[in-house]
Amino acid sequence: MVEKEEAVISEEEAAQYDRQIRLWGLEAQKRLRTSRVLLVGMRGLGAEVAKNLILAGVKALTLLDHEQVSSEDSRAQFLIPSGSLGQNRAEASLNRARNLNPMVSVEADTENINQKSDDFFTQFDVVCLTSCSRDLLVRVDHICHKHNIKFFTGDVFGYHGYMFADLGEHEFVEEKAKVAKVSKAKQEVEDGPEAKKAKIDPTESILVKKKVQFCPLKDALEIDWHSEKAKSALKKTPTDFFLLQVLMKFRTDKKRDPQPSNYQEDSELLLQICSDVLDSLGVSPDLLPKDFASYCFSEMAPVCAVVGGVLGQEIVKALSQRDAPHNNFFFFDGRSSNGIVDCLGSK
């Protein structure tokens, strides 16, 4: 992880981030202002995450994407101006991204992430990957875990979206209401069950230091569902976890995501992959509904907004070391407008 310089908040920055400083404190904002973030994949979800991080006030954000702007990007990617077809996605997003907050250094990198060396990632405090293959996600997470770099990933497939975090051993502070001390004399006067309960003082709070351990992505994805412990937890596991496994396998096999222009063929392929994946995991073939394939095509802007909001929030929490992080998955189902946080894998 990159060495941190001493944080100094100028008067101009204090005015710019006044609301945030009131919300999570000066020290948390100082940590953000010394943080460097790598964001990979500038599709709809990437645009949402970029917006949230730039407005939060990180020190520097690198947008990495080697792909060109396509007609599908207009569905959810609001940082790319119209008339940008054929341009590099990261470069096309640069101007609007910079205009969101001139105090944040925003740069574009047009190189393919697969060509990046392990050392490339060590210059960042947080690495966030979107629209990447499973093998690449596992590789980059391994690098980040080894070098104590906060790792995040997320994707949106139609009505469905997810995010995952691997923060290694993460320390944070949480604000708790202060327990008011009650004098012995008052306890004797106010005798009874209520008098013995802790008195919460809503006007005062204290910061409590905590520590939590995260597991690597590889462990979270490779759960042995044949074990008795896993079988007992299966009923509580979000079905979107298994949908994610299916969509990752599709991306690995086809080197792309399901395309609306190829709906019939891709729907049939998704059903076949679903059968194979669930069988290999040793879970029921009926775990996913038969019509699941109808709801996981393309990126939907509202789903990108929700997942991007959560993903951006979690990155800010990790960098500022303020409040408990989501450990380790967040799944969102746009059909039911339901979001679930679940901890999967060994710790």
UniProtKB/Swiss-Prot annotation:
Entry-linked Pfam families: ThiF
Keyword Transcription among UniProt keywords: no
Gene Ontology CC annotations of this record: SUMO activating enzyme complex
Pathway assignment: Protein modification; protein sumoylation
Gene Ontology molecular functions: ubiquitin-like modifier activating enzyme activity
Subcellular localization(s) per the UniProt record: Nucleus
Biological process (GO), any one: protein sumoylation
Claim: Ligase is one of the keywords in the record: yes
Keywords: Ligase, Nucleus, Ubl conjugation pathway
Task of the protein: The heterodimer acts as an E1 ligase for sumo1, sumo2, and sumo3. It mediates ATP-dependent activation of sumo proteins followed by formation of a thioester bond between a sumo protein and a conserved active site cysteine residue on uba2/sae2.
Family that this chain belongs to: Belongs to the ubiquitin-activating E1 family.
Subunit record text: Heterodimer of sae1 and uba2/sae2. The heterodimer corresponds to the two domains that are encoded on a single polypeptide chain in ubiquitin-activating enzyme E1. Interacts with ube2i.
Protein name: SUMO-activating enzyme subunit 1
Source organism of this protein record: Xenopus tropicalis (Western clawed frog)
